[in-house]
């Protein structure tokens, strides 16, 4: 039987986002990612760009890319995804510095009792249709969060 791999919440995508907050002087919500903290401390960066490659885990790199290729040869370390490891939950965690249980953006399609609809979250459509779920962004309205950029701007004086 395969061993269950649990998320390492001390070394995760949420930690990465919190390192960015820390670097720009914004309050952090959780542990930071030591590897990124060290990298950011080496120089004074005016901008930090995060490139999120959905589904690009270590096993994908090892199994599909050349060892001397760009990604494999520049790999500095690994960290855990959040749980649930869905595109929506992971992306929102990177964008907010919060765990899915805190931001509540859990999956591609989520049911919102307040409007009695299942919404394709990132598209703001009724699930399985092209029809807008509402005339406002449902998930952002009912489960609001501040993006990293908003948090940094708010705390930059």
Please identify what each model-predicted range represents.
Residues 1-35:
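N- or domain-start disorder-to-order transition segments that initiate the globular core
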Residues 5, 45, 50, 80-83:
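Generic structural signal for short, flexible, solvent-exposed coil/loop and linker residues
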Residues 7-19, 58-157:
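Active-site-proximal alpha/beta segments of enzymes that process anionic O-linked groups
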Residues 33-45:
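A short acidic-Thr-Gly-centered motif at the start of a beta-strand
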Residues 34, 54, 76-77:
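Short secondary-structure boundary micro-motifs
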Residues 46-58, 94:
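Beta-strand elements within well-structured catalytic alpha/beta cores of enzymes
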């Amino acid at each position: 039987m395969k061993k269950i791999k649990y998320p390492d919440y001390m070394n995760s995508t949420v930690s990465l986002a919190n390192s960015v907050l820390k670097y720009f002087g914004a309050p952090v919500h959780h542990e930071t990612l030591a590897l990124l903290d060290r990298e950011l401390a080496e120089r004074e960066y005016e901008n930090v760009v995060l490139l999120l490659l959905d589904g690009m885990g270590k096993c994908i790199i090892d199994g599909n890319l050349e060892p001397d290729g760009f990604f494999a040869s520049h790999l500095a370390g690994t960290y855990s995804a959040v749980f649930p490891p869905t595109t929506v939950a992971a992306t929102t965690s990177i964008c907010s510095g919060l765990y899915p249980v805190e931001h509540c953006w859990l999956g591609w399609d989520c049911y919102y009792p307040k409007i009695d609809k299942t919404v394709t979250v990132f598209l703001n459509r009724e699930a399985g249709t092209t029809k807008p779920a509402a005339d406002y962004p449902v998930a952002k309205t009912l489960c609001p969060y501040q993006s990293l950029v908003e948090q940094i701007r708010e705390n930059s004086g």
